[in-house]
Amino acid sequence: MKIAALTDIGSCRQENQDNYCARQLTDGTGWGIVCDGMGGANGGRVASAIATRTILQYFDRQLPGVNPGEEKAFMMRAFDIANRAVYDKATSDPDMLGMGTTGVCVLQRGGLAHIVHAGDSRAYLWHNGAIRQLTRDHSMVQQLVDSGQITREQAALHPQKNLITRALGVSASIVPEYNRREISPGDILMLCTDGLTNMVADAELGLILQETAFFDAPGVLVDRALKGGGQDNITVLLMGVETTEGTNG
């Protein structure tokens, strides 16, 4: 597996409240996490940093002992621990009250991508020239789309499009969403914050991944989001599948 990533403050924000981390292991396994913090003052930046650091520490300690078929429980537990870490900070420090963060995490091993997420940061799969969104936004407008009250096109312009319904750290417990997908050599998994997807349409994301060298693609994607307005922090994490050998689940 190969990894390329980039984060940018954008054109309209005073600080970057996004965070990310990724690891490439010797057996072909790899994982990555992207978080988009929220909260006044420094709360969003702190929340995303705590969540990312907690996930990193948990994966470093526990992933080597995860057997095939245990990936879902492992990743759900990781989000539960990260949620508690952010929540404990938010409720113990008055300056951090109300902070939280989205999170989208992918574990790639043995021909499968295991995905857990909370919020509207997304995972995509680029496969054979086509891009597909793997996650469903936990947001107010997504609920309106799902119920047929508005279209996806209307959702992109909705005044409440940034109102999320699930996030790490806003309550004592969380129920993240898990799914998994088969992956093949040559595929690209992309994790990103809404600073990218609010500025660049899915079709253009796929075209950029198809036409751009892997390690150049994060820069091209971020630049395109900046040219589109750069209204939020922008984070892109790419994981290129080079082999599907290793532990299968």
Model-derived segments and their meaning:
Residues M1-G249:
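PP2C/PPM-type serine/threonine phosphatase catalytic domain
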